[in-house]
């Protein structure tokens, strides 16, 4: 992505304007798979300027992001707690546990070793009945508009769908893992993947109780 455009997107107003037409689409699988109903404590990793916060106004919500301008903007617009933090080195309080962890369009900005470290830490923060919800940018294998836009994205690490699935399932027991196209006027502009997972130690117990 052009460096000037990337710098513009670091401004909260510009980022919110750019995301507005697609925010509802991106979060649709989260709603459809119980990510916003009945949850108590939410950790939104890479929360931006509060892009997802309104979905969790009824919860004990913590959003973290490395951009202080995003966090300042989010604090002025939403309830809940927002914290400036580098997600690749973020460490929660020892007793912090969340029944919903959301990672929305963050991991394609991060090299694989840091992604694995982050997901390993997030697994320890889930409650026994909690779930992680991940929405990520896919790099399609063939030339297409979604492949071009993935290449032009600010993130340097869009990955093929199979690679995302392998990364996610190596840390969490899959509950849902589906392709999720996002676009406009019936045209797919980005290929995304939606993943819902649980802590491996608790997945079998939860299935047995349902």
Give, region by region, the residue ranges found by the protein language model.
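Hydrophobic adenine-recognition pocket in adenosine-nucleotide-binding enzymes
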Residues: 106
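Class I (Rossmann-like) S-adenosyl-L-methionine-dependent methyltransferase catalytic domain
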Residues: 1-92, 110-117, 121, 131-210
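A conserved beta-strand element that flanks and buttresses the S-adenosyl-L-methionine
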Residues: 102
């Amino acid at each position: 992505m052009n460096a000037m455009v990337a710098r513009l997107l670091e401004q909260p107003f510009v980022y919110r304007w750019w995301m507005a037409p697609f925010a509802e689409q991106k979060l649709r699988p989260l709603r459809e798979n119980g990510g916003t109903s009945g949850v108590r404590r939410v950790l939104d990793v890479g929360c931006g300027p509060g892009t997802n916060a309104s979905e969790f106004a009824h919860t004990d919500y913590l959003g973290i992001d490395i951009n202080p301008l995003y966090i300042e903007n989010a604090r002025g617009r939403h309830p809940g707690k927002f914290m400036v933090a580098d997600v690749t080195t973020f460490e929660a309080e020892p007793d912090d546990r969340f029944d919903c962890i959301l990672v929305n369009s963050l991991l394609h900005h991060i090299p694989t070793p840091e992604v694995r470290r982050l997901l390993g830490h997030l697994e320890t923060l889930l409650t026994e009945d909690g779930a992680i919800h991940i929405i990520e940018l896919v790099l399609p294998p063939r030339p297409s508009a979604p492949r071009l836009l993935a290449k032009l994205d600010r993130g340097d690490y869009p990955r093929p769908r199979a690679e995302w699935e392998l990364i996610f399932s190596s840390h969490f027991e899959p509950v849902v893992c589906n392709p999720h196209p996002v676009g406009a006027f019936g045209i797919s502009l980005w290929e995304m993947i939606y993943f819902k997972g649980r802590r491996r130690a608790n997945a079998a117990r939860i299935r047995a109780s349902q």
